[in-house]
Amino acid sequence: MTSDRQDRPGPDLPRHERRPRRSPSPRRRSRHHSSRRADLRGRLGAWLAAGVVAVLVIGVTGLYLLHHDSPVRHLATGTSGAAAGPGGQPGSTPAPASDTGTVSITDVGDMNFGMNGHYPPGGVGSLFAGVAGDLHSSLTVGNLETALGSSGTTKCGAGSTECFAFQAPAASARAVRQAGFSAVNVANNHTDDAGAVGIQETDAALSAAHLRWTGRPGQTTYLVRHGIKIALLGFAPYSYDRNLLDIPAAAAAVRRAAARAQLVIVFIHAGAEGAAAQHVRPGMETYLGEKRGDPIAFSHAVVDAGADLVLGSGPHVLRAMQWYHGRLIAYSLGNFAGYDTLGLDGVTADSAILHIRLRANGTFAGGSVTPIRLVGAGSPEPDPARTGIALINSLSRSDLGASGVRIAASGKIELARR
């Protein structure tokens, strides 16, 4: 199996995912014998007919259950965000008996591991030591904001002091995998830091480490957890990523993914950067003359198209979280890890780890936030002051009002009030 599968135009499913046609039962031939044998054959025929009916009923049921990632199945279980229930309340529509399974998802913010030969002396894995117990779930993901490898051409000109090109050794991918990560988003403004060769080396390093990735143009990544098929799509406002600025195309890609998978998770690398970029507002955001997308409009559009969870990165600060049609949108989890590559003054050092459980039909089954703070050169550690919770609550309330997520002091994500 390849690490990633590209979207194909049109709604047709691959051959192995199509519902097989049921062959008609063969007709039984009979000959006229004695009346006694005819009577026995008549009774036998009745028994066989009853058996065939039972087999057909079981067979049809089996086909339905085995091919549960068909478009019809999604409409029935409400994977489309618009079917979440009155008021868009999470959990307002009880999960059907066949959708009682859940997937636990852990998400972190932006991570890179150094540049220009300056890397953690204890290895990349040492960056995660302080939060090692928080990175294990059915699916642990994050935003990989660096190229991996040793070749390629840097995007920065000679002697540049305002340009940052991140590239870490290919072995860094193995350290990320060993820390507990299953997949990473590569749709961001640093995936091209070593040019086209760097992109190829990054993909090769991730593949060798058995670490899945998403975010290249046209790329949708599929994986299975606990029998639940999950689609991952990443978007950013750059030509070498899946395009965040074309909302209709993004929505169409999500609809195709929702027709093939039970859960759809969308990563967005969107918005301005830095301490002044904590607030999320409607409209296009810009930074350094670049259009960085409209995070709210984009997130709402992909949920309307069938996304069950939207995970944001890019601003390098914590941002608000929102309930929209019963689906959770986290606009930014801030920084997660770096090595002398991230400005860590004030709010840029405050971060969080998001833990979510989703049912197979996409509805919210529970979640929590672990507040962390980056210390030293950029290592995450638990934050005793729990600043991240207070920040997310404040931003969610001020920026999003009633749809803003509320997090209890314990870190538990509360259901939206009806």
Model-derived regions: residue spans:
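Acidic, metal/ion-coordinating pockets
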Residues: 2-21, 26-32, 36-37, 42-418
